[in-house]
Amino acid sequence: MSTFPSFDVLIIGSGAAGLSLALQLPNTLQIAVLSKSQLGSGSTSWAQGGMAAVLHDRDSVEAHVTDTLNAGAGLCHEPAVRFTIGRSRQSVDWLVSQGMAF
């Protein structure tokens, strides 16, 4: 009888979201990241270096929310859009603190 490895957390997806989650979980947990291809092969690279984030005073959360909802053609969940964009600066700052170069 074969045995399977045991993990506390299984993360499905190895793009920026999945790998960010893995980095933020406590080191005491046994974590597995499941990817359909090599690690880092998620859709994040499709952004080609671009990222929608409110980083300057001349920009606004409301402008990004409006743009995202318009581009989403009715498919976006507005509370999720507002939550994500409202925290975009924090997310970029965290990525930079982890060594991400933009």
Q: Where do the PLM segments sit?
A:
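Conserved N-terminal/central alpha/beta ligand/cofactor-binding core
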Residues: 36-102
